[in-house]
């Protein structure tokens, strides 16, 4: 079982590493490519667009051909794209490389969740996804630090060579350690069960909405945090970095505690707790009389996301034993596109950073609480504890 957990964690971590590691080198990249930092900030959106594009087909291919035939090309593409970015001499070529990086990371991301659905029952999967969420929270803190240390001695291109090295590690794991987990091709008698695994299932759609809103909350916080903490609250850059590191610490602590909480409380209880924390955070930020209270509200955001997201993802994947890849893709596309759409619309309408965060917190909590309370899970699908190997 450990091989599947190690491979899944490695496959997922390409996604945040591709986002966070290069940011520290952005000023030098812009200077070398004769572009402004503002022009290259679009590289974040281009990377997410690549991920979303990969998710359109990766899940279906993973369900038809297997997990490895998607993971291996995905890791290989991430390696090639990282090298391409390091060799880029214009901003257009750099952005093209970032799109290809997103494609590779998106393929790996989809496969990771499909593998966990294949190999773990509902309760164990919720625990593992919570742990995975905690590990993912480390990357936004460690990646810029690692990038800074690399750039003390080497040029910015070394950041992408480091990403390529990470991709090589994932490729080796996918080639030599990962075993195929896709369930055997459905027989005629399995067709009714396959057809019953509809993406229009009310329970699945409710979890898509809940996880998309939750991701929108955390990405809105990440996007608005420089404005909130430095421009509005007046913290210096060093203090901002410290606060963000502390919020990551809160996220990790709660994420690593959630598996133990699942041994005591029902998943539904933790999901309700998550949304109550979001609601409390929104109200706290709305009425906050001081910076200290506002910072407390921010910690509630991190705790709320960490306690509920892994559980909600596990529940979303639960109904799909034969279409786990497609379900994973659907979740990823909804989360990437939904959160990006909200942030873009809020900016176009002219909603301030503070109100943008408060608005999504309150909307997420109210909608999600209603869905949790009124949309019950259907008949549970048998878990795939036994791995099906293919010749």
Swiss-Prot record:
Could you list this entry's UniProt keywords, alphabetically sorted.
Antibiotic resistance, Cell inner membrane, Cell membrane, Membrane, Transmembrane, Transmembrane helix, Transport
Give the principal location in a single coarse category. Answer: membrane
Q: Which residues cross the membrane?
A: 4-24, 42-62, 69-89, 93-113, 131-151, 158-178, 203-222, 245-265, 269-289, 293-313, 331-351, 356-376
* GO BP of this protein: response to antibiotic
Does Transferase appear among the keywords?
no
- What does this gene product do? Confers resistance to chloramphenicol.
Write down the PANTHER family for this protein, in alphabetical order: CHLORAMPHENICOL EFFLUX PUMP RV0191 (PTHR43124:SF3), PURINE EFFLUX PUMP PBUE (PTHR43124)
This protein is called Multidrug resistance protein MdtL
User: Where does this protein come from, organism-wise?
Assistant: Escherichia coli O127:H6 (strain E2348/69 / EPEC)
Q: Which gene encodes it?
A: mdtL
């Amino acid at each position: 079982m450990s091989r599947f957990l190690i491979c899944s964690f490695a496959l997922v971590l390409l996604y945040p590493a591709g986002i966070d590691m290069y940011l520290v080198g952005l000023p030098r990249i812009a200077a070398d490519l004769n572009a402004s930092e503002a022009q290259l900030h679009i590289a974040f959106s281009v990377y997410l667009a690549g991920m979303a594009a990969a998710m359109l087909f990766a899940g279906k291919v993973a369900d038809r051909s297997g997990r490895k035939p998607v993971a291996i090309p995905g890791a290989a593409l991430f390696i090639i794209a990282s090298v391409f970015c390091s060799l880029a001499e214009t901003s257009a070529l750099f952005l093209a490389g970032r799109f290809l990086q997103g494609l590779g990371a998106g393929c790996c991301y989809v496969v990771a969740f499909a593998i966990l659905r294949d190999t773990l029952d509902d309760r164990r999967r919720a625990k593992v996804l919570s742990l995975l969420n905690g590990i993912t929270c480390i990357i936004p803190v460690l990646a810029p630090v690692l990038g800074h240390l690399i750039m003390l001695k080497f040029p910015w291109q070394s950041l992408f060579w480091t990403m390529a090295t990470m991709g090589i590690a994932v490729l080796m794991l996918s080639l030599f350690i990962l075993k195929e987990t896709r369930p055997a091709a459905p027989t005629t008698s399995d067709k009714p069960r396959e057809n019953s695994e509809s993406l229009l299932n009310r329970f699945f759609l409710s979890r898509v909405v809940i996880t998309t809103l939750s991701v929108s909350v955390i990405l809105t916080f990440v996007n608005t945090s420089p404005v909130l903490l430095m421009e509005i609250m007046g913290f210096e850059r060093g203090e901002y970095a410290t606060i963000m590191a502390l919020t990551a610490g809160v996220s990790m602590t709660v994420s690593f505690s959630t598996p133990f909480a699942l041994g005591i409380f029902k998943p539904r209880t933790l999901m309700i707790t998550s949304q109550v924390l979001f609601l409390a955070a929104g109200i706290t930020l709305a009425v906050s009389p001081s910076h200290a209270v506002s910072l407390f509200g921010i910690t509630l955001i991190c705790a709320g996301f960490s306690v509920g997201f892994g559980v909600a993802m596990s529940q979303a994947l639960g109904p799909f034993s034969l279409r786990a890849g497609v379900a994973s893709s659907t979740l990823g596309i909804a989360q990437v596109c939904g959160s990006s759409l909200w942030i873009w619309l809020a900016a176009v309408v002219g909603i301030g950073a503070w109100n943008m965060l408060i608005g999504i917190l309150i909307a997420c909590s109210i909608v999600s609480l209603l869905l949790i309370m009124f949309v019950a899970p259907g008949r549970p699908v048998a878990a795939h504890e036994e791995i099906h190997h293919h010749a």
